[in-house]
């Protein structure tokens, strides 16, 4: 039996500005992955998606999932748009090199011109110089459940897509999307747990666990698979 043990790699950029009230997660997937995405959503948040969106008090890194595209840390929410803007101004956010995006959620019928106008309204509530090309921080607004929401937007890390071009692969290896989902479902998003892949093959699941910040060990009875897993990692 050959064992492959990975090291735990973690990194974070922490910007403490606002305390979130809750989090809005936006999902995207191919139609044949809908049930798989709902399974993951139940494991991570305790609920299934509603129109590819989950609103939750549970904080998760978007990159843990192959389906989560971004997480909005909602700091201001109000049904009245003018009061919503006043609340943002009251925060007194002062910084340079920011940008404001508009998240289009299913059911939002605002046209492009209206969305641009909303972005500008919110941008004028922030004291500082925007940077549309290389922002240091991204804010976003959206309209969900008859309420306007504002907060810091965290996007997925798409580097995991490169793992489809691993040095070694078997014809019966599971796909990268399935591997990434298995990690999030098995762990329920808790990076403190240690995972075990008892038949790791070329290390597809292990690689996705490592890049998401999990500790994982793997083993395989096939020496060829063992060496290929090491090279892939």
What residue ranges belong to the model's regions?
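Non-catalytic nucleic-acid substrate-recognition regions in nucleic-acid-modifying enzymes
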Residues: 1-2, 9-130
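Broad gene-expression machinery/nucleic-acid interaction feature
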Residues: 20, 136-138, 147
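Short, amphipathic alpha-helical segments
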Residues: 112, 116, 135, 172-176
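Short, surface-exposed recognition loops or helix-turn segments adjacent to catalytic cores
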Residues: 130-140, 195-199
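SAM-dependent Rossmann-like transferase core, predominantly class I methyltransferases
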Residues: 141, 147-189
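Conserved S-adenosyl-L-methionine
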Residues: 174-233
